[in-house]
Amino acid sequence: MPQNEYIERWQKQHGKRLDHEERTRKRIARESHKQSQDAQTLRGLRAKLYHKKRHAEKIQMRKRIKAQEERDVKSAAPNEPSTTPLPQYLLDRSQATNAKALSSAIKEKRAEKAAKFSVPLPKVKGISEEEMFKVVKTGKKTSKKSWKRMITKPTFVGNDFTRRPVKYERFIRPMGLRYKKANVTHPELGVTVQLPIISVKKNPQSPMYTQLGVLTKGTIIEVNVSELGLVTAGGKVVWGKWAQITNNCENDGCVNAVLLV
């Protein structure tokens, strides 16, 4: 038996007190009074941590109560199906008999909506700042100032990008590591097309990398898909669509991505 279970060991050897159940019942009954007293008397950091814990407990309690109510509540629909014929415009409506079925249908729709925007690579390995940036030392006489950083990963900058003056440029994006096109694969059509990159939408490493336009594995980019001839349900041509980078661009020398459809 583990060393920390000495109470259980004692109870197995000698049994419990005769008033064990009564003491347990009273201790549980006092819990609400103890919680109320702590909520009123605690101060400072302990109060913040206590309120955060109670807030999470109340959320879970409300969820359990709501789930219980949905399981029990019945709708006002009749128990037996009606024999009178329905008009044509009402035939497509489902005859849900309880609230749980309606709730389940709503949850399924939400899950489908979430799956619509699921990505091929949900998790990627983190990249440290030492790997991402190279320190560039500056200074006229002594190279002691090291506030500049050179980005060692591929980047994307727009056509209207202009470098800042050298004196004020903190992040340097080398010309040899700038990419304008990506090899995008359509998962349903099974074709790979080289499409121009419009913008970097989300870099999973950091919001700063998104702002700098760094292209790493798992980054969401927007590409120009007008060449594919995709159209919406309304008949309009789709111009920009999102894609996720699936390779390490700095090793392969190109950007490979999968279109999010």
Curated annotation (Swiss-Prot):
Pfam families: Ribosomal_S8e
Record flagged with keyword Transmembrane: no
Localization annotation: Nucleus, Nucleolus
Domain of life of the native organism: Eukaryota
Chain spans, region Disordered: 1-87
GO cellular component: nucleolus; ribonucleoprotein complex
Signal sequence segment: none
InterPro entries, sorted: NSA2_fam, Ribosomal_Se8/biogenesis_NSA2
Motif placement: Nuclear localization signal 2: 51-58
UniProtKB keywords: Nucleus, Ribonucleoprotein, Ribosome biogenesis, rRNA processing
Principal location class: nucleus
Motif (Nuclear localization signal 1): 15-22
Regions of compositional bias (Basic residues) in chain numbering: 45-65
Ranges of compositional bias, category Basic and acidic residues: 1-36
BP terms from Gene Ontology: rRNA processing
Family according to the record: Belongs to the eukaryotic ribosomal protein eS8 family. Ribosome biogenesis protein NSA2 subfamily.
Assembly and interaction partners: Component of the pre-66S ribosomal particle. Interacts with NOP7 and RRP1. Interacts with RSA4 (via WD repeats).
Functional note: Involved in the biogenesis of the 60S ribosomal subunit. May play a part in the quality control of pre-60S particles.
Official protein name in the record: Ribosome biogenesis protein NSA2
Gene that this polypeptide is encoded by: NSA2
